[in-house]
Amino acid sequence: MQFSTVISALTLSAVAVFAQETVVSDGVTYVDVTETPEVTVSAVSTELSTSTPYSTTTLAVATLETYAGDNSTSTEHTVEPYSGAALKQEVLGSSLVGVVALVAALL
């Protein structure tokens, strides 16, 4: 029991070093987690609950990564303009049916 308690305390202290949480008065929580010096993950969570049966939850996650590659070689690429239909009518119709079904399922 004492060994697991020590491990839990060490784990919590290690997480506290890498995650920094800021809570503001409006119920908005900002969390910045740094996994390595090259990768930073930021999350913003907003939760609003009232006496009515309505509640709003927003979660946004952004990841920034630094690219490290081999600069000794290079590859030439060309960009070709696309010519064709932007969206077929059948695809558009099925997409709208899918969106309506999804909204109906959520309500």
Swiss-Prot record:
Entry membrane topology: Lipid-anchor; GPI-anchor
UniProt KW keywords: Cell wall, Glycoprotein, GPI-anchor, Lipoprotein, Membrane, Secreted, Signal
Keyword 4Fe-4S: no
Lipidation (GPI-anchor amidated glycine): 84
Processing after translation: The GPI-anchor is attached to the protein in the endoplasmic reticulum and serves to target the protein to the cell surface. There, the glucosamine-inositol phospholipid moiety is cleaved off and the GPI-modified mannoprotein is covalently attached via its lipidless GPI glycan remnant to the 1,6-beta-glucan of the outer cell wall layer.
UniProt GO cellular component terms: extracellular region; side of membrane
Protein's cellular compartments: Secreted, Cell wall; Membrane
Signal peptide: 1-19
Highest taxon in the source lineage: Eukaryota
UniProt propeptide residues: 85-107
Keyword RNA-binding tagged: no
Glycan-modified residues: 71
Family according to the record: Belongs to the TOS6 family.
The protein's name: Protein TOS6
Gene from which this protein is expressed: TOS6
